[in-house]
UniProtKB/Swiss-Prot annotation:
SUPFAM superfamilies: Class I glutamine amidotransferase-like. In the presence of PdxS, forms a dodecamer of heterodimers. Only shows activity in the heterodimer. It holds the Pfam family SNO. GO terms for biological process: glutamine catabolic process; pyridoxal phosphate biosynthetic process; pyridoxine metabolic process. The gene is pdxT. Keywords: Glutamine amidotransferase, Hydrolase, Lyase, Pyridoxal phosphate. GO terms for cellular component: cytosol; glutaminase complex. Pathway: Cofactor biosynthesis; pyridoxal 5'-phosphate biosynthesis. It comes from Listeria monocytogenes serotype 4a (strain HCC23). Its EC number is 4.3.3.6, 3.5.1.2. This is Pyridoxal 5'-phosphate synthase subunit PdxT. GO terms for molecular function: glutaminase activity; pyridoxal 5'-phosphate synthase (glutamine hydrolysing) activity. The active site is at C79, H170, E172. NCBIfam families: PLP_synth_Pdx2.
């Protein structure tokens, strides 16, 4: 059975663990770099990307997560996870640099502009996915290596590149585990 870690420093950690288990994998909380050993994949949950980056640096997780990805291990970033995984963040903040695109933090506005929307996602059997956007980012300037999986109003809100999958929204806050199944079956 596949073993997936969830970076447990902020965000909907328990919801991601439930989603991983509902998709048929084992889930583990990751708080330290040695927690990455033996994992097949890692989820970087939503939260506040600047705070998450600071905590990752304090606990010496930035370089181990980069090394994890460079070993070919899969990473799924949601919301703030998308921001952290992007090659660049508008405004010049440090990132993991693993997805060749630029992230626009809070691209859809602040907390009061949070919303739900139906997305068309060609990689799923069902026609739409109900997505929850909370202070959501989006991507711009993806390289040719990046495959866009979903957009809303022309803004990229889901993408993949090699062993990296990102969503600007929070699939873990729904009862629909298709994004996690996609991660386990197609990205891992």
């Amino acid at each position: 059975m596949k073993k997936i870690g969830v970076l447990a420093i902020q965000g909907a950690v328990d919801e991601h663990i439930q989603m991983i288990e509902s998709a048929g994998a084992l889930a583990f909380k990751v708080k330290h770099s040695n927690d990455l050993a033996g994992l097949d994949g890692l989820v970087l949950p939503g939260g506040e990307s600047t705070t998450m980056r600071k905590i990752m640096k304090r606990y010496d997780l930035m370089e181990p997560v980069k090394a994890f990805a460079k070993e070919g291990k899969a990473i799924f970033g949601t919301c703030a996870g998308l921001v952290l995984l992007s090659k660049e963040i508008e405004g010049g903040e440090e990132s993991l640099g693993l997805l060749d695109a630029t992230a626009i933090r809070n691209g859809f506005g602040r907390q009061k502009e949070s919303f739900e929307a139906e997305l068309s996602v060609d990689v799923f059997d069902a026609p739409t996915f109900e997505a929850i956007f909370i202070r959501a980012p989006y991507l711009i300037e993806p390289s040719d290596e990046v495959t866009v999986l979903a957009t809303i109003d022309g803004k990229i809100v889901a993408a993949k590149q090699a062993n990296i999958l990102v969503t600007a929204f929070h699939p873990e806050l729904t009862n629909d585990n298709r994004w996690m199944r996609y991660f386990l079956e197609k990205i891992l």
